[in-house]
Amino acid sequence: MARNRLTENELNEALTELDGWQKVDGREAIAKSFKFKDFNAAFGFMTRAALHAEKLDHHPEWFNVYNRVDVTLATHSENGITELDIKLARKMNAIA
């Protein structure tokens, strides 16, 4: 999977297909807050997402409180957003 930074146009196009994901102010990253029925559902999501992240060798920044999981994605080695971030965001949307 390519680790080249996306152009602004590529990122904007990708975001139109990623429900709920937005650019992070002051940083080259994308973020989304997921809400679930309860803690078990939130933790289940994190477990499934972690397995996909490991397969991609690309790991999210995330924060969990009860039924909410806040996720931020960026490719640190590229100091920006790459196709890996978009692929993981798509997978997270699909399993949420």
Swiss-Prot record:
Gene3D superfamilies per the UniProt record, alphabetical = Transcriptional coactivator/pterin dehydratase
Q: One GO molecular-function annotation for this sequence? A: 4-alpha-hydroxytetrahydrobiopterin dehydratase activity
Reactions performed catalytically: (4aS,6R)-4a-hydroxy-L-erythro-5,6,7,8-tetrahydrobiopterin = (6R)-L-erythro-6,7-dihydrobiopterin + H2O
Q: Which EC numbers does the record give?
A: 4.2.1.96
Q: Name one Pfam family in it.
A: Pterin_4a
Top-tier EC class: lyase
What's a GO biological-process term for it? Answer: tetrahydrobiopterin biosynthetic process
Q: Which UniProt keywords apply?
A: Lyase
**NCBIfam families registered for this protein in UniProt:** PRK00823.1-2, PRK00823.1-3, PRK00823.1-5
Belongs to which family? Belongs to the pterin-4-alpha-carbinolamine dehydratase family.
Q: What is this protein's record name?
A: Putative pterin-4-alpha-carbinolamine dehydratase
